[in-house]
Amino acid sequence: MGKTISLLISVVLVAYYLYIPLPDAIEEPWKVVWETAFVKIGTDLASFGELLGISHFMETIQLLMSFQEVPPTSDEHVTVMETAFDSVPVRIYIPKRKSMALRRGLFYIHGGGWCLGSAAHFSYDTLSRWTAHKLDAVVVSTDYGLAPKHHFPRQFEDVYRSLRWFLQEDVLEKYGVDPRRVGVSGDSAGGNLAAAVTQQLIQDPDVKIKLKVQALIYPALQALDTNVPSQQEGSHFPVLTRSLMVRFWSEYFTTDRGLEKAMLLNQHVPMESSHLLQFVNWSSLLPERYKKSPVYKNPTPGSSELAQKYPGFIDVKACPLLANDNILHHLPKTYIITCQYDVLRDDGLMYVKRLQNVGVHVTHHHVEDGFHGTFSFPGLKLSERMKNQYLSWLIKNL
């Protein structure tokens, strides 16, 4: 009897975690199911631990992910070292092959919803050493303070300090980087930070060396409207759901779950900040194919108290899509990846449109069978294709 019950429970658990309906267009569905199941198991463990008062949701996932970190080991192609730029930990990847000329420099910012991840995580270490070797570039992969221990603007400030340090002439010279060929890149929350620091840099008169390019990989760019079409469609998208993304956004600003609840209802922007909604109005910024089903409605005004306590969600340093056109106009050549089955899809699409409207040179790669986090799954054919296209653009433009 006991064995039968155990078997039954096992079958139910396997079915629960492996029953993940996927869009027909997604390639290698079983691999995607397994990856999504692992994410689901991790978030369920974190939720259970939080419910019991054992640990904060994000701290549990941080612990689980720490087992996937790797040491800064050099290989036959790349020398890897760790240091600090203005007290911010960074991992540096330098190609071993001799070069008579100065190399490109790429400053990379990892994703993880401002709460998770590190330059040492195996997926980011793999990406950085691959990029350094294939691009023949010096890659700096930066860390930054994570929530819930640190909230906005700590993440932005850490990344900006680290980038400013890298852009000093003597630092670039030390690592053999051509000051005319430096770019910034990041994925997801890292794409958010990459966009934000790039905007800040063009307004900083103290930084003489400017970025040549920015490459944003499925970036998160706004927290004002949590009900854009991709969010409405994305309750069951692989890896990143709407509810998890809202949790990441709210944790970026505070551990107060009241903000999360308001964001889930899309009732967090106060009336006095409603003018900012013009910058995220998907009815005018999205391609027609995404405007057919849902009908655009202005979010219901929220509490002024929330915005006063946690002003980050209406701050351009946290939400780069809120930048004025006169700032966007000065941005460098830009590459943006968006994925069809990603709750952040529309953030990227709206940014593409706004940059095009002000004359920025934008290359937009929309992946029809893509989903959030693909770069972090090196075993997928789709991941390899996307990374190769990313690399090709960097080779031509950086």
From Swiss-Prot:
Disulfide bonds join 115-339. N-glycosylated. GO terms for molecular function: deacetylase activity; lipase activity; serine hydrolase activity; triacylglycerol lipase activity. It is a single-pass type II membrane protein. It holds the Pfam family Abhydrolase_3. The chain crosses the membrane at residues 6-26. Keywords: Disulfide bond, Endoplasmic reticulum, Glycoprotein, Hydrolase, Lipid metabolism, Membrane, Microsome, Signal-anchor, Transmembrane, Transmembrane helix. Highest levels in liver with lower levels in jejunum and kidney. Residues 27-398 are lumenal. It catalyses: a triacylglycerol + H2O = a diacylglycerol + a fatty acid + H(+). GO terms for biological process: lipid metabolic process; positive regulation of triglyceride catabolic process. Its EC number is 3.1.1.3. Belongs to the 'GDXG' lipolytic enzyme family. This is Arylacetamide deacetylase.
